[in-house]
Amino acid sequence: MSDREQRDGGRSAENNNDRKGRNNGRRNDRRNHQDNERDKYIERVVTINRVAKTVKGGRNMSFTALVVVGDGQGMVGVGYGKAKEVPAAIQKGAEEARKNFFRVPMIAGTITHPVEGRDAAGIVMMKPAAPGTGVIAGGAARPVLECAGVQDILSKSLGSDNALNVVRATVDGLKQLVRPEEVAARRGKSLEEVAPAQMLRKRAGQEA
């Protein structure tokens, strides 16, 4: 025990231990909070690629990960991570995806109207579908729709098969979706004049 600790009866050591305990407790709380936040979301890794950068001393190898994250209830985001290890690249992609969250308008588990998304050479067509149809989508478009919580949809990729282009085209299409109330307000009409009767019945059944 140091002279200072002897003079104050060992209180300094006790205070230090208490301080360390509080700091460890805060770190554990933050870690648990992050784990809980992660558990709330659906996470899908679309692609992982290895890339090489040629430098003076040779080649620097790294990995890229295209990640989709959503809550399954209308929120979804896409992120692109790059790191020297695969887990780190996936983590960076997931963090970026959470920053890019946006809401997808849906009625009874399907999108509100037909839409076509484009990005570079990627073209994705999406149409509403009847209950029980399921997610009719292939390739990189399916993870985006599933993470968003879309249950019934008809979609088709009409352009490039590149995963990044397809994902971005799907996101572009979903961002074009508008709620019937917005269309009615824009046109100065009632909801019944704008939205099909079948859609209104679906919404009434969903809210009941």
UniProtKB/Swiss-Prot annotation:
Gene3D superfamilies on file: 3.30.160.20, 3.30.230.10
Protein name in the entry: Small ribosomal subunit protein uS5
An annotated GO BP: translation
Gene transcribed to yield this protein: rpsE
Its biological purpose: With S4 and S12 plays an important role in translational accuracy. Located at the back of the 30S subunit body where it stabilizes the conformation of the head with respect to the body.
Domain S5 DRBM intervals: 41-104
Subunit-level organization: Part of the 30S ribosomal subunit. Contacts proteins S4 and S8.
Source organism, top-level taxon: Bacteria
InterPro entries: Ribosomal_Su5_D2-typ_SF, Ribosomal_uS5, Ribosomal_uS5_bac-type, Ribosomal_uS5_C, Ribosomal_uS5_N, Ribosomal_uS5_N_CS, Ribsml_uS5_D2-typ_fold_subgr
Annotated stretches, region: Disordered: 1-38
